[in-house]
Each structure stands twice: as C-alpha cells, then as structure tokens.
Amino acid sequence: GARVISVARQGYGNALTGGINAARGRYIIMGDCDYSYDFSGLQPFVDALREGYDFVVGNRFSGTMEKHAMPFLHRYLGIPVLSYLGRKRFHTFIYDFHCGLRGFTATSIRSLNLQCTGMEFATEMIAGFANGNHKIKELPINFRCDKRKGASHLRTFSDGVRHLYFIVCKKTLN
C-alpha cells in the first residue's frame, strides 16, 4: 500500500527527495499522480530492476501518446532539445529526460546525493546515474492526458531555463 508523507519545503526535487528518503523498499518507482501514467503497466520496470538495472526511465515518445497529452512546444521543441543536449553532455542514450515515470534501486538513488530542489532534479538524476557507471534502461510507456482539475505546476520557460542551466553549467556530483 501507499504511505503519504509530508515534506516541509516546496519544490519537485524536495518532494521526490522526501519520498526517496522515506521509502522502505529495495526498489522505488515514482510517477506523477495526474493520471497521465498507467501504473498498471509497471511490471517491465520491476522486471528490469530485478534483472540488475539501477535506473529505469520511461520514454513517452516511443510508446503511445494520447492526443493533447503534451503541449505542442514541449513535444516538438523543449523536451527533444533539452534531452539532446543532456545526452551529449552526460554521455547517455536516454531520449526522454523529462519523463516522470522512473524506477531505481534504493541503494543507487541514495548514493547519488542529489541536490536540486526544483524541476531540474529530473535532469540531475539522469546525470548522476549516467556519470556514476550505473546500469540504465529506457522503456516505452503510454502517456495520457492529465485528468486533474486545476492548473499545472509546470512553468515552461523558467523550468526549461533551469534544466538548460544545469546541463550547460553544473558539474555532476559523482
């Protein structure tokens, strides 16, 4: 079952770090709870972790994507460009740097000592795994429209700039 925890400081990175630190299992799988990810399809993630992968990340572009599940500029400009730059900078094959459906071993994620508190945490995580000689796998996933009521917390321009700054300027922690 799920356990709800409270995190004192706001921010995507802070929330995920709080969840990672509170997790009790050998494997941790994270995903946005906006109905855009199909959590009934997690078996390939679990299988990959059991096969010895340290980090498993979804690829929304290689699975089925519902119409309007992702804004046009994110789908055709922002995510592809930032992912391309991230692949070159961190020498990894991951094509969807910003997919929120991810799995990892508790030991490996905690060894990365991730520091980012905002959305750029997603890029920092990939950089940490890529630069730390970890075994990585990317899996196609299905991506659906956000079914929540209310506004998204994503701030396209400022979040994109922070991801870009991390890719270009930050030294990796490993």
What is the meaning of each model-derived region?
Residues 1-5:
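Acidic donor-binding segment of Leloir-type glycosyltransferases
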Residues 88, 132, 170:
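Phosphate/oxyanion-binding loops and surfaces in catalytic or ligand/nucleic-acid-binding neighborhoods
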Residues 7-22, 27, 39-119, 145-154, ...:
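Acceptor/aglycone-binding surface of glycosyltransferases and processive sugar-polymer synthases
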Residues 92-93, 114-117, 126-144:
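Catalytic donor-sugar/metal-binding loop of nucleotide-sugar-dependent glycosyltransferases
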